From Swiss-Prot:
GO terms for molecular function: hormone activity. Residues 1-26 form the signal peptide. The keyword Signal applies. This is Hepcidin-2. Keywords: Antibiotic, Antimicrobial, Cleavage on pair of basic residues, Disulfide bond, Fungicide, Hormone, Secreted, Signal.
Length: 83
């Protein structure tokens, strides 16, 4: 019984040590990525800004058509298109 308890304690100790070492390694990796992230973020924001501006411009000019609410003062039109 004492041998199995010691074996279980040794396994538990090894698991704890492994989790501590992996946690330390992950924290180091996170620090490295956060140090590099601001530089990468500025470059990627500049690349993303151009397509987003084009997309917004197209969306604004795209008409949205729905059933007429008589906002265009043409009660017989049936469909209103707003830009």
């Amino acid at each position: 019984m004492a041998l199995s308890t010691r074996t279980q304690a040794a396994c538990l100790l090894l698991l704890l040590l492994a989790s501590l070492s992996s946690t330390t390694y992950l924290q180091q990796q996170m620090r490295q990525t956060t140090e590099l992230q601001p530089l990468h973020g500025e470059e990627s924001r500049a690349d993303i800004a151009i397509p987003m501006q084009k997309r917004r411009k197209r969306d604004i000019n795209f008409p949205i058509c729905r059933f007429c609410c008589q906002c265009c003062n043409k009660p017989s039109c049936g469909i209103c298109c707003e830009e």
